[in-house]
Amino acid sequence: MLKILIPIFLITGLVYSQQNYPADTVLASLQTNIFEKTVILPIATWQRISYNSELLACQFYPSCSNYGALAVRNYGPIIGTAITADRIVRCNPFALNYHYEMHGEFHYPDYRLVDSVQVSRPRYTSNKSPVLAAGLSTIMPGTGRMYAGRFLDGLMGLWMVLLPGTAAYGSLKDGKSIKGNFFAGITLIFYLGEIYGAYRTAKYYQGPK
C-alpha cells in the first residue's frame, strides 16, 4: 500500500508546487490521467536537475525530458515511452550533422535543434519506405534507421537495445527476477522505440535530393 501511496503523494506535491519547469504543466494538466502522471513524474524530477546545469543541457527543442512528457500525455504511457526512447537514441553526438543534412530548423536564441513530437508533413519527399524501415528494425533493431540514411543513429539504437537486453538475460539467468524484469522492460521500450524511430526517420528525416 505504501508503494502505491508514495508516487501519488509525490505527484500531488509537484502538481501543487510552483510550476517552473515544462513537464510541470503537463503533470498538472487535467487531460493527463494518473498512469500518465506516474510516468511523467520522473521526467519532472529530472528537469529540476538538468535545467539547472549547463552540462546536462539538451541539444534539442523541446528538450528530451519535455518531449517525453508531451509524448506520454498525447499517446499514453506505453507508446509515449517508446516515442521518448526514439528521441533519446537520436540525442547523440551525430544529431547536429544529421540536422544540417535535412536542413532542419533551429530554435532562437539558443540555436537548439527543433524537433517536435508531432510532425504534420515531411520537409522533403522521401524515396525510403517508412513501412520497410519499421519492418527492418522489427527484425534487427537499428537496421531501419540505417536503411533510412542514418547509419550512426542505427548503431546507437542497436546498442540501446542490446545493452539492457544483455543485462536482462544475465539477471534472469542468475535468478534475479526483479532486476531481470526491470531490464527486460527497458529493452522492450527501446525495441518499440527503434520500430517507431525507423518509420519516423524514413518518412520525416530526409534531406533534399
Protein language model regions, located:
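Boundary at the C-terminal end of the N-terminal hydrophobic targeting segment
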Residues: 15-18
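Hydrophobic alpha-helical membrane segments
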Residues: 26-209
